[in-house]
């Protein structure tokens, strides 16, 4: 039996496509359906490791969790990881296949479509329902030739589309009606209905708006979805998810963790468990602002291009702020790329990251990193040292780091391998492990080191509870039975 398929496309970026697919995945999974999420092409530096040892966009990993299945490389067969303003690393079915500038990538698309359809068929063979998420805006008709992310995929796979608009940003009628106006008629015919997301207030006040959109487009009105504030508790994939929380007011008595927002910040969902703690204020420091003097911990996050981000870090004067923080007795933690920056030197003999082949590090750890072509992708478990507190997380990095401070590892993996480094005074640390703070035991340990305590809430269980409430929210406000009826079989 062939799975039914349905695609959620958007009138623009950040209209809530990922969230709606996650919520619908949980809603239909709770009905007993075997659900698989799918996004043909994603662009993000926030990635997750799959059981196959590949990588996919973090949003698809969350959607897989919502569907109550393990994430697979087939859920996001093409992942673009930006390395510059014009170029990206290209990951196909979980494996890095090269880098391409935007114009070059257009020539790649025809051959990538076969990989996309192969992964799609793989998921259809094991599911009752495949929920597909589009990318960006459905109305970008200038990119239609060779498209594999929106209507190009919908047409190639015969997947019907529901168009999602965001009323919170204004102009939702124009964005929905206007999308139909600019689409090729054959593309527009793939759209069977529409949803309006993030409504605030009395829904009866927009009843005539829903009717107007339906009349102008001929599409079925499938739901007016009220704003869901708890969405902020779910891991964000886009850097847009970091906006609006820069330099928040510190809660009285809270420990301050300062995080510089690097140009190519990656895997920043490492911060989410810390942001959920009432005893912590995570201060996201944007370019143009100094690292706050009141910080208890400066956390250097992951980076897609470590050398370029280190150069940008210095250009902001943050290296001076960080040195002053250390002299005041403050703590420093580097995660993955941030760990590499803390060393004496970073070398890139193969030019993996670009033209700069070597750069001096921040010199806070006596280690040297050499970039290597092979990427380490794996789920890991082990214990921190010397306290032997267990942890689970994942590795996703290029490069090997060695030096005297690495003889004092921060962690030890279950297979006995050491990871990370600790300075002689114990106040500067680095590790390659992502997801450390999502482990309740490790988060409690780090907060204790900062002189506070965890609220004791199970972070992962909290994510599932929010997904359940999101599913209930959508069941109330979306015509879910009608969505199933629209899905192609």
UniProtKB/Swiss-Prot annotation:
InterPro entries: Class_I_gatase-like, CobQ/CobB/MinD/ParA_Nub-bd_dom, CobQ_GATase1, CobQ_synth, GATase_3, P-loop_NTPase. The active site is at 336 (nucleophile), 434. The lineage of its organism: Bacteria, Pseudomonadati, Pseudomonadota, Alphaproteobacteria, Hyphomicrobiales. Pathway: Cofactor biosynthesis; adenosylcobalamin biosynthesis. Transmembrane segments: none annotated. Belongs to the CobB/CobQ family. CobQ subfamily. Catalyzes amidations at positions B, D, E, and G on adenosylcobyrinic A,C-diamide. NH(2) groups are provided by glutamine, and one molecule of ATP is hydrogenolyzed for each amidation. Residues 254-442 form the GATase cobBQ-type domain. Keywords: Cobalamin biosynthesis, Glutamine amidotransferase. This is Cobyric acid synthase. It comes from the Bacteria. One of its GO terms (biological process) is cobalamin biosynthetic process.
């Amino acid at each position: 039996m062939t799975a039914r398929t349905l695609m959620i496309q958007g009138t623009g970026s950040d209209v809530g496509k990922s969230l709606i697919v996650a919520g619908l995945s949980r809603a239909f999974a709770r009905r007993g359906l075997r659900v698989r999420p799918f996004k043909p092409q994603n662009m993000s530096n926030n990635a997750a490791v799959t059981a196959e040892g590949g990588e996919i966009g973090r949003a698809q990993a969350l959607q897989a969790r919502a569907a109550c299945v393990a994430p697979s490389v087939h859920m996001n067969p093409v992942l673009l990881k930006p390395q510059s303003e014009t170029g990206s690393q290209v990951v196909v079915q979980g494996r890095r296949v090269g880098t391409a500038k935007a114009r070059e990538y257009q020539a790649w698309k025809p051959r990538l479509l076969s990989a996309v359809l192969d992964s799609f068929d793989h998921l259809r063979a094991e599911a009752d329902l495949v929920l597909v998420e589009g990318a960006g805006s459905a109305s970008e008709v200038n990119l239609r030739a060779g498209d594999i992310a929106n209507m190009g995929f919908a047409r190639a796979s015969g997947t019907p589309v529901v168009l999602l608009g965001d009323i919170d940003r204004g102009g939702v009628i124009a964005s929905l009606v206007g999308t139909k106006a600019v689409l090729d008629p054959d593309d527009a015919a793939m759209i069977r209905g529409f949803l309006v997301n993030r409504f605030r207030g009395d829904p009866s006040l927009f009843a005539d708006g829903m009717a107007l959109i339906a009349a102008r487009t001929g599409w079925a009105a499938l739901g007016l979805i009220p704003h869901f504030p708890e969405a902020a508790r779910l891991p964000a994939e886009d850097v847009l998810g970091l906006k609006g929380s820069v330099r928040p007011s510190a809660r009285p008595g809270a420990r301050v963790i300062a995080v510089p927002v690097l140009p190519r910040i990656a895997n920043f969902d490492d911060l989410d468990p810390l942001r959920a703690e009432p005893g912590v204020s995570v201060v996201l420091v944007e370019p143009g602002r100094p690292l706050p003097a009141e910080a208890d911990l400066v956390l250097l996050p992951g980076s897609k291009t470590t050398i370029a981000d280190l150069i940008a870090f210095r250009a902001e004067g943050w290296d001076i702020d960080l040195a002053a923080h250390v002299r005041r007795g403050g703590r420093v933690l580097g995660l993955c790329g941030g760990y590499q920056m803390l060393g004496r030197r970073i070398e890139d003999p193969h030019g993996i990251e670009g033209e700069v082949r070597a750069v001096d590090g921040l010199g806070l750890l006596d280690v040297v990193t050499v970039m290597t072509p092979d990427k380490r992708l794996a789920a890991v478990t082990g214990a921190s040292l010397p306290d032997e507190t267990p942890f689970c997380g994942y590795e996703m990095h290029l490069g090997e780091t060695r030096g005297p401070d690495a003889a004092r590892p921060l962690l030890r993996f279950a297979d006995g391998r050491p990871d990370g480094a600790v300075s002689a005074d114990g106040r500067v640390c680095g590790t390659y492990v992502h997801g450390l703070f999502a482990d309740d035991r490790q988060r409690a340990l780090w907060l204790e080191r900062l002189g506070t305590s965890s609220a004791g809430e199970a972070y992962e269980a909290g994510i599932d509870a929010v997904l359940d409430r999101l599913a209930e929210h959508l069941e109330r406000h979306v015509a879910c039975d009608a969505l199933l009826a629209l899905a192609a079989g």
